[in-house]
Curated annotation (Swiss-Prot):
Classification via InterPro entries: HATPase_C_sf (IPR036890), Heat_shock_protein_90_CS (IPR019805), HSP90_C (IPR037196), Hsp90_fam (IPR001404), Hsp90_N (IPR020575), Ribosomal_Su5_D2-typ_SF (IPR020568)
Region (A): 1-345
Functional summary from the UniProt entry: Molecular chaperone. Has ATPase activity.
Protein name: Chaperone protein HtpG
Main localization (coarse): cytoplasm
Region annotation B: where it falls in the sequence: 346-562
Organism lineage: Bacteria, Pseudomonadati, Pseudomonadota, Gammaproteobacteria, Alteromonadales
């Protein structure tokens, strides 16, 4: 392909949006472009090293992998070169012309227009190569794939299109030439570049080199000749795998910068754990808990997992086999001495070494969270606000660690009456009333709906704390969380209410008397409502409301039905149990109503009100409005 055959291709729409966003949102942190490009170059070296394990000829006599940075002040350019894996034509187009990653639509949907918030999102998304356009108005990429003879040149001004052509290139790998904007000349200074590499990329295991100019022959103070020192490429980073170094010699800043390298996050992590395990299974783990949840945490196609190394050789990204799904937010890496270098995802799936490492890493994260909850409550609250809903998947997924996970759970509660989820099950148990045998909770669509649930009335009256649950995952979680500290967890919206020792004899007698006053009402309402309800009965869980609906112990709760329907699954129909407050004036008036038509209308209105309070929706809202209007019209006469 000659220069005349240069192709002009258009960027994918999302790339254009991303480039525009970066230039306007990331100008306050421009120097990160070098971190991103050096990180990419190091990854290219890692990938070649892995492939060369089985295809040694890919090295072509050049096995010393490195990244080189040079600056030309006169031309106002920076060049970042690597002798890593390189790219084919198709890989150039897919890597530099499109964003081929899941969650792209979610990313753009989450943008707010607030530059500080958007810059955080861009960091989570991982811009990599495109960060070059923060400082450059023209970027040239020359690349040759290892094992191939054809090379390609990609060039763009970061606007709507790019050019692509075949070129001659001596060695494999990729050269990225940044033609700096006039106002970004400071980055064409070698000392400036060295300081950025030291700041952000000291931990990169691939040597990052810059050219040290020749020192000519000179004379010393006593007239002796000092021989010339030839120019050479010298490493300006440590070029040792950070995780292989002793914890005692690593600073917090080094751990934080390494986190940004492995996670593509731009924020500091919340916490981390660095461990070397010896014995039957030998491995090193460096695990991080992020400060912010990624925007695509709930995307089913999202890739998660740890970077996997075997004997310090990079094997794969996103090795999900080492963490349970409820810890999918954890970032970091594993370096195993026991796995084979030719390990595949299939081999990892049913491997005893994998299972031992997974068990150890899971335990380590749980202990890290336990320490944080105990010693750094504010940090733990930050963590819970971001990742609490994911942790709530734990009791169902991980029976072996269920008790420990339960101690990490946090809830809203009537004790605080705040939407903030900061009450632990241990705190609840410590505050339980004398004679209280169960941990009570209510599940609703929102915190406000839970807080105002009529089912809470008797509990507020008696001063019994109730956990207020309103996350989408809560009903499913509670179906797997039935006991804690030998106390049964009881939904206050299921089954007949039994407060056990918390009910005194005097109260029970008063309740029985109030039921006698409206004897026969239950049967009349059963007849009026027919098969709309499973059962009608009196209750003493209410103090201010006339009626409520509850789920039978053996039926699926209304919240679980909603959850199943929201994910497209058919939920078995479960009719509610309709409960009446015999002490409420409306119920007494209903008992006195002799007109059976009006009686039926009022019965339906009471049921619909109770269903609205419990579920927030009605199957027939028009029928409810019609009945209510009719009754109000009659009352106004």
């Amino acid at each position: 392909m000659t220069a005349a055959q240069k192709e002009t291709l258009g960027f994918q729409t999302e790339v254009k949006q991303l480039l525009n966003l970066m230039i306007h949102s990331l100008y306050s942190n421009k120097e990160i472009f070098l971190r991103e490009l050096v990180s990419n170059a190091s990854d290219a070296a890692d990938k070649l090293r892995f492939l060369a394990l089985s295809q040694g000829d890919l090295y072509q006599g050049d096995a010393d992998l490195r990244v080189r940075i040079s600056a030309d002040k006169e031309a106002n350019t920076i060049t970042i070169s690597d002798n890593g894996i390189g790219m084919t034509r198709d890989e150039v187009i897919s890597s530099l012309g499109t964003i081929a990653k899941s969650g792209t639509a979610e990313f753009f949907k989450n943008l707010t227009g607030d530059q500080s918030k958007d810059s955080q999102l861009i960091g989570q998304f991982g811009v990599g190569f495109y960060s070059a356009f923060i400082v450059a108005d023209l970027v040239t990429v020359r690349t040759r794939k290892a094992g191939e003879t054809t090379a390609y040149e990609w060039e763009s001004q970061g606007e709507g299109e790019y050019t692509l052509q075949e070129i001659e290139k001596e060695g494999r790998g990729t050269d990225i030439i940044l033609h700096l904007r006039e106002e970004e000349k400071e980055f064409a200074d070698e000392w400036r570049l060295r300081s950025i590499v030291t700041k952000y990329s000291d931990h990169i295991s691939t040597p990052v080199q810059m050219y040290k100019a020749e020192v000519p022959e000179s004379e010393g103070e006593d007239g002796e000749k000092i021989p010339a020192v030839p120019g050479e490429w010298e490493s300006i980073n440590r070029a040792t795998a950070l995780w292989t170094r002793d914890k005692s010699e690593l600073s917090d800043d080094e751990y934080k910068e390494f986190y940004k390298h492995v996670s593509l996050d731009w924020e500091d992590p919340l916490s981390w754990a660095h461990n070397k395990v010896e014995g039957k299974t030998e491995y090193t783990s460096l695990l991080y808990i992020p400060k912010k949840a990624p925007f695509d945490l709930w995307n089913r196609d999202r890739q998660s997992g740890l970077k996997l190394y075997v004997q310090r050789v990079f094997i794969m990204d996103d090795a999900e086999q080492f963490m349970p799904s409820y810890l999918r937010f954890v970032k970091g890496l594993l370096d195993s001495n026991d796995l084979p270098l030719n390990v595949s995802r299939e081999i990892l799936q049913d491997n005893k070494v994998t299972q031992a490492i997974r068990k150890g890493c899971t335990s380590r994260i749980i202990k890290m969270l336990e320490r944080m909850a105990k010693n750094k409550a504010d940090d733990y609250q930050v963590f819970w606000n971001e990742f609490g809903q994911v942790i709530k998947e734990g009791p169902a997924e991980d029976a072996a660690n269920k008790e420990a996970i339960c101690k990490l759970l946090r809830f809203s509660s009537t004790h605080t009456d705040s939407a903030t989820q900061d009450v632990s099950l241990e705190q609840y148990v410590e505050r339980m009333n004398e004679g209280q045998e169960k941990i009570y909770y209510v599940v609703a669509d929102t915190f406000t709906a839970a807080k105002n649930s009529p089912h809470l009335e008797i509990f507020r009256k008696k001063g019994i704390e109730v956990l207020l649950l309103s996350d989408r995952v809560d009903e499913w979680m509670m179906s797997h969380l039935t006991e804690f500290a030998d106390k049964q967890l009881q939904s206050i919206t299921r089954g007949d209410l039994d407060l056990g020792k918390l009910d005194d004899e005097e109260t029970k007698k008063a309740q029985e008397e109030s039921e006698k006053e409206v004897a026969g009402l239950v049967e009349r309402i059963k007849t009026a409502l027919g098969d709309e309800v499973k059962e009608v009965r009196f209750t003493h869980r209410l103090t201010d409301s006339p009626a409520c609906v509850v789920s039978d112990d053996n039926d699926m709760s209304s919240q679980m039905q909603k959850l199943m329907e929201s994910v497209g699954q058919a939920a078995p129909e479960a009719k509610p149990v309709f409960e009446l407050n015999p002490e409420h004036q409306l119920v007494k008036h209903l008992n006195d109503e002799q007109d059976e038509d009006k009686f039926a209308q009022w019965s339906h209105v009471l049921l619909d009100q109770a269903l609205l309070a419990e579920r927030g929706t009605l199957k027939d809202p028009t029928g409810f409005v019609t009945r209510l209007n009719k009754l109000m019209l009659e009352l106004s006469k």
